[in-house]
Regions:
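Catalytic glutamate of the conserved HExxH
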Residues: 69, 73, 329, 573, ...
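Proteolytic maturation boundary segments
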Residues: 21-34, 263-302, 344, 447-561, ...
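Bacterial N-terminal signal peptides that target proteins for export
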Residues: 1-7
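M16 family metallopeptidases and their MPP-like homologs
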Residues: 38, 43-59, 65-66, 83-176, ...
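Bacterial N-terminal signal peptides
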Residues: 7-15
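Carboxylate/His-rich catalytic cores and anion/metal-binding grooves
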Residues: 194-204
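Non-catalytic, conformational "gating/processing" segments within enzyme and secreted inhibitor domains
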Residues: 183, 190, 205, 209, ...
Length: 714
């Protein structure tokens, strides 16, 4: 059966159901904590998060890194969690705090080293009265998964998923950790943070991001790295960390977020009982700091990355600003996942290797950024200049500035944003992060529920107005250049030679024993119903597996062909070109992308060692038309020679930088250890042969791959 008829048959086989109702509840506890409960009974679990409205932007100027340090030590227990004998541990803990204060007053390295050894001895002594890692073990005991935390510029989150039957235990331990916390093992966590700092210092991607933020935000704390400055990391004070906790971790600065299979009416009394015992703290008065405003064109350069890149930075708006959604639409008009944007055309036409536009709206300020990677000429072994790239990017940008786009293009962009929102709403975790962001910025909870209506309401005149207002002649041009050798930024943080800390293996605190004994009403187990996955044999080489989406009317479909790069090495490059292909006889890539966009659909091609994939998502009402359009492209792909030359240049440039990339070297070594001569790095097309790739050959390779057996997942 030909692919066109195959996809149309699939489209007619499927039946659709409306999404299930969900409910968002919001309340404030007596101590000021904000509670969000998003009920979704279709989920098997609950995602729980405690989010604090504090991040690295709130670090004291002379003690940067405290927010991140605190995230690490918040897992070290309290006067009950991890405590085997707090009365004996307490005086040792207080000595450790005093020793760090004593150390901070010294400048002599030898004297500091002597105190470090004293602290190490005290830490080893205190460890005899602590169970060690008990919070994590309690989460494991209740069936929790994905325990983690993260520190950002404006907020800090602690979270994991857990079975609905374990709600009381989760509320108990997450509230208990906020009552009399004990920052045990501070010294060992310093080692972990030092290693993290050194890792970022060696990573060119991290160094590039730091450079961009330093230049974009000037004197604002957003310009500092989240992990902190090295001179402050080398001079830690536990007392300062305790002060930071007491200042920022009060309930009025905290949100409790529960998303998934939960009943708000049953949960609220338990939440009150557990979290209202967390003591209210003094009100916080946060001073908003001024943000750098660009005037005219400002240029900065740095040799820090694997390859050259141009970044154009414009002043934007803070999160929750009335113009934020309109600016999101502007960025989508420039570049988007469907590759229908004004800047996307530069990549589709082969004029530039890669380009994208994005908005980063944070609590105090925001920036708009355009990133562009020049093309690499494999024949001349050189990159295009930053100047030429900036010229063609600005030329395309003028189309946005001048409002050169129509209603149809705008509506397709808005529908794509709505579809991506619907996909996010399928995830408990994504919902929780969105709620945490709303809490952090003080936005109304209705913003998340009414997001689709807000997007639909944005008019073409509003988009044109903000495009002209923000994408103006006042911007920062960052010429990021290739670094042959990356010098260390400042001094690497040397890991101290401490004696290892040994805790009592297998020991449990009385608190842990009590938590584990809390009775649980086991829910009715809902096993996966494999019969709900319907199967249809399309022909001798194609089989369809499909199931209904209970969440919404968004579909995802994957065609999985039984051939990969192990047997067809050139397929890697054929598939890469298919992602930017047009359609014979005369449909150009951008026209094809926009035709898909008008159907609210998105299609991507991928390949691995053993399989080739064609993936499409969209709305069910447009499934038949989207399948018809996709099948025509698969049958009659129009690959572009200019794109091929850009792809070859990209491969040449990428391989040139491999020996300077720690991550790539690690990957190559691991691959060789596992597979020896069958390693992907040894089996790939030699660099010297890339120049001989042709459109005819790659088209033939792709079409041959579509003749292999195919499984379709809907």
């Amino acid at each position: 059966m030909k692919i066109k008829h195959l996809l149309c048959f699939i489209a007619l086989c499927l039946f659709f159901t409306p999404g299930k109702a969900q409910q968002l509840s919001v309340m404030t506890l007596r101590n000021g904590a904000t509670v969000y409960i998003w009920e979704d009974k279709s989920k098997p679990d609950v995602f729980g998060m405690i989010a604090f409205k504090v991040g690295s932007v709130d670090d004291p100027e002379q003690y940067t890194g405290l927010a991140h340090y605190l995230e690490h030590v918040m897992f070290k227990g309290t006067q009950t969690i991890d405590a085997l004998d707090w009365e004996k541990e307490k005086p040792i803990y207080e000595k450790i705090i005093a020793k760090y204060d004593e150390r901070a007053a010294l400048s002599d390295p030898a004297a500091r080293e002597a105190i470090d050894k004293e602290i190490n001895d005290l830490t080893r002594e205190a460890a005899q009265y602590a169970a060690g890692n008990e919070f994590s073990l309690l989460v494991d005991h209740m069936g929790g998964q994905g325990l983690n935390a993260s520190t950002g510029y404006d907020q800090t989150e602690y979270h994991n998923s857990f079975p609905p039957s374990q709600l009381e235990k989760w509320l108990e331990i997450y509230s208990e950790r906020l009552i009399d916390p004990v920052f045990r093992g501070f010294q060992t966590e310093l080692e972990a943070v030092y290693e993290e700092y050194n890792m970022y210092n060696d990573d060119r991607g991290s160094r590039m991001r730091e450079f961009i933020y330093e230049q974009a935000f000037g004197d604002h704390p957003y310009a500092r790295p989240i992990i902190g400055l090295p001179e402050h990391l080398k001079n830690p004070q536990l007392s300062k960390l305790i002060d930071f906790y007491n200042t920022w971790y009060g309930p009025q600065n905290m949100s409790i977020i529960l998303v998934g299979n939960i009943d708000a009416k049953e949960a609220i009394p338990m939440i009150r009982d557990k979290f209202e015992r967390v003591p209210r703290r003094a009100e916080i008065h946060r001073e908003k700091k001024p943000v750098r405003q660009f005037k005219g064109r400002t240029e900065k350069s740095a040799k820090i990355f694997y390859y050259p890149m141009l970044a154009l930075i414009y002043n934007g708006v803070p999160s929750n600003d009335k113009e934020e959604i309109a600016l999101d639409i502007c960025c989508e008009l420039l570049s988007n996942s469907q590759k229908t944007g004004i800047l996307d055309k530069l990549q589709l036409d082969g004029d530039i290797m890669s380009v994208g536009a994005s908005q980063n709206a944070m609590r105090d300020a925001g920036i708009l950024m355009i990133n562009a990677i020049p093309s690499f000429d494999a024949n001349q072994n050189r990159w295009d200049s930053h100047k030429s790239v900036e010229k063609i990017v600005l030329s395309s940008l003028r189309q946005l500035q001048n409002g050169e786009f129509d209603e149809a293009t705008l509506e397709a962009i808005k529908q794509n944003m709505i579809r991506e929102y619907d996909l996010q709403m399928e995830s408990n975790e994504m919902k929780a992060y969105i709620l945490a962001s709303l809490f952090n910025t003080g936005a109304d909870p209705s913003d998340i529920v009414n997001f689709k209506e807000k997007v639909k309401a944005v008019t073409i005149d509003e988009v044109k107005a903000v495009a002209k207002k923000y994408f103006n002649d006042n911007y920062l041009a960052l010429n990021i250049q290739e670094a042959k050798n990356l010098d260390s930024k400042g001094q690497k943080l040397k890991k101290p030679d401490y004696k290892p800390i040994e805790t009592k293996k297998g020991a449990k605190s009385e608190y842990a024993k009590w938590v584990e004994s809390i009775p649980v009403n086991m829910p009715e187990v809902k096993y996966c119903d494999f019969n709900s996955i319907q199967q249809k044999q399309i022909n001798t080489r194609s089989k369809l597996f499909y199931n209904l989406n209970p969440e919404n009317d968004v579909f995802t479909m994957t065609l999985k062909y039984g051939i990969g790069t192990k047997k067809m090495p050139k397929l890697e490059y054929a598939v890469a070109l298919m992602n930017n292909a047009g359609m014979l006889p005369d449909i150009e890539p951008l026209a094809f992308k926009r035709a898909m966009g008008e159907l609210n659909a998105n299609c991507t091609y991928a390949v691995d060692d053993n399989y080739m994939y064609v993936m499409m998502s969209g709305y069910e009402k447009d499934l038949v038309k989207a399948c018809q359009l996709l099948s025509k492209q698969i049958l009659f792909p129009k690959l572009d020679d200019k794109q091929l030359q850009s792809l070859i240049g990209s491969a040449f440039g990428s391989r040139q930088m491999e020996k300077s990339s720690i991550g790539t070297l690690e990957s190559a070594l691991t691959s060789y250890v596992l597979y020896k001569d069958s390693s992907d790095y040894l089996q790939r097309i030699p660099t010297r042969d890339l120049i001989d790739l042709s459109i005819t050959d790659l088209t033939t390779q792709f079409q041959a791959a579509t003749n292999y057996e195919c499984e379709i997942y809907y």
